[in-house]
Design a protein with these regions (language model features):
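Short beta-strand scaffold segments in enzyme catalytic cores
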Residues: 17, 36-38, 44-48
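Glycine-rich beta-strand-to-loop/alpha-helix junction loops that act as flexible
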Residues: 40-42, 170-179
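Glycine-rich phosphate-binding loop plus the immediately following alpha-helix
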Residues: 10-13, 50-95, 117-118, 122-126
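A cross-family phosphate/adenosyl-ligand binding-site feature
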Residues: 6, 36, 81, 98
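A contiguous, well-structured pocket-lining segment that forms one wall/lid of small-molecule binding clefts
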Residues: 89-170, 180-183
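Conserved phosphate-binding catalytic cores of ATP/NTP-utilizing and phosphoryl-transfer enzymes
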Residues: 4, 9-34
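Short beta-strand-loop/turn "lid" adjacent to the catalytic site in phosphate-handling enzymes
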Residues: 1
Length: 183
């Protein structure tokens, strides 16, 4: 109605391809095909990228996304929102092997983070019942262990995708890609 042309842009494809925006046009061609681990507050996907407009989702979350799990666990700890930067900062000072949280055992390349959230919540409830100051005294180790578990879940499936497809080039995109443990 305004007489202005509309350009169709897929937000998730933008995340996948943003790596290839360069100053010199000749430097912008991605090494097709490649895999992209797309992780954010709303999405956890493994995408096979064949060309700029040819992408195939090989695996995705069947419930909560990785970033959503981080945000919710941060909230349960009373750390605030968004939880990603907070958990990332605390994890740098913690022991990633201090606590063991549930990891899903689902076939294929799909992700699930709801079991991890439940495991984290129930563990915290038990520990806080025994020691009301538990979170404050152990927040660095809790953050590091949570981050370690989430990265482990993400990487297991990504390694499987590399093995299944034979594609060696991998990009990581989305807000959770800023996490130091994932990098």
């Amino acid at each position: 109605s305004l007489g202005i042309p509309m350009i169709d842009v897929n937000h998730l494809q933008g995340h996948v391809l943003v790596h290839f925006i360069k100053e010199k046009p000749e430097d912008t061609t991605p090494p097709f095909p490649f895999l992209c681990l797309l992780v954010s507050g709303g999405n956890s996907q493994i995408v096979k990228v064949n060309a700029y407009n040819d992408m195939e989702v090989l695996g995705q979350t069947i419930d909560d996304a990785a970033g959503e799990a981080i945000d919710k666990c941060s909230k349960v700890m009373g750390l605030g929102y968004p939880g990603g930067p907070i958990i990332d900062r605390l994890a740098r000072q913690g022991n990633p092997l201090a606590y063991k949280f549930s990891e899903p055992h689902i076939p294929g390349l799909d992700y699930s983070f709801s079991g991890l959230k439940t495991s984290f919540l129930y563990s915290l409830r038990k520990w806080v019942q025994d020691d009301p100051d538990f979170i404050e005294h152990h927040k660095n180790d809790l953050a590091a262990s949570l981050e370690h578990t989430i990265v482990n879940i993400l990487m297991k499936k990504l390694r499987l995708a590399v093995k299944q497809t034979g594609i060696k080039h991998v990009a990581v995109a989305g807000g959770v890609s800023a996490n130091n443990g994932l990098r």
